[in-house]
């Protein structure tokens, strides 16, 4: 939803430029390219939103590229067999201590994948070729973090990029971005996050179970891997997808009464998390 708003603001600016008018969103440039990383298991509405964005981008001259970034497939293959990517699973020790795993999936399967695409495909670098001086911190990477996500706004460790967070600078929260997309573009959006993201509320998994049983089965399979296999290197904690630190199949209605909503013209809209 947040990144979708940022992309559509760029499209709106492109349309304004074609008409000889000033940019509607001065902090948002007309992007050379925007990138969506398909992590292998996305909620159905996410792919529909991406298709909508691609159509808008084609009509406005703002390209949107979809890159395959197989987080889901890699995790299924590697967990319990070799070192797997660190996803922020909820942890629980025998003594009751609770914590979370480090979150490396966004960097490894989104930011780094985009950086490689820019370096190899857009800038034409070859393997082992050193960066040209003009490319050292010579490119902006705009991220669709909303104003409620300021803690995620950090410098980019890649020597090519300077991170920018226009939605944060404009003070736009998730509700603002939803309203913008709905009012200007006519699309009702939900949050974009892989189906097995541990930051989902329990309501999300209940929604999948009732409306997208095939997707729910895939997520349950991951939860069973967390239960049945020992991570490498071994840990002294049990790992869970659910923030309640229960198996998804064991969640009860009371556990799932945690959906988050925001107001849109007097309506309560589920944010998709």
What are the residue ranges of the model-derived segments?
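Nucleotide-activated chemistry modules centered on ATP-dependent adenylation/adenylyltransferase
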Residues: 1-273
């Amino acid at each position: 939803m947040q990144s979708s708003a940022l992309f559509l603001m760029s499209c709106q600016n492109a349309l304004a430029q074609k008409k000889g008018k000033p940019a509607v969103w001065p902090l948002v440039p007309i992007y050379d390219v925007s990138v969506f990383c398909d992590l292998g298991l996305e909620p159905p509405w996410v792919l529909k939103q991406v298709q909508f964005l691609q159509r808008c981008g084609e009509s406005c001259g703002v390209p949107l590229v979809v890159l395959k970034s197989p987080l889901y497939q890699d995790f299924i293959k590697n967990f319990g067999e070799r070192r797997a990517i660190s996803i922020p699973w909820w942890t629980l020790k025998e003594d009751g201590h609770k914590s979370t795993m480090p979150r490396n999936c966004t960097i490894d399967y989104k930011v780094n994948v985009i950086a490689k695409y820019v370096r190899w495909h857009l800038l034409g670098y070859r393997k082992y070729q050193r960066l040209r001086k003009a490319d050292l911190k010579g490119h902006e990477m705009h991220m669709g973090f909303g104003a409620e996500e300021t803690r995620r706004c950090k410098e980019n460790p890649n020597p090519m990029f300077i991170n920018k967070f226009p939605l944060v600078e404009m003070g736009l929260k998730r509700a603002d971005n939803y309203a913008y997309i709905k009012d200007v573009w006519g699309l009702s959006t939900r949050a974009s996050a892989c189906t097995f993201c541990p930051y989902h509320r329990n309501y999300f998994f209940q929604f999948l179970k009732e409306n997208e049983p095939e997707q729910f089965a895939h997520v349950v399979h991951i939860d069973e891997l967390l239960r049945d296999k020992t991570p490498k290197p071994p840990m002294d904690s049990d790992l869970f997808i659910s923030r309640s630190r229960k198996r998804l199949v064991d969640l009860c209605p009371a556990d799932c009464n945690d959906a988050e909503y925001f107001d849109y013209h007097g309506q309560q809209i589920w944010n998709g998390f």
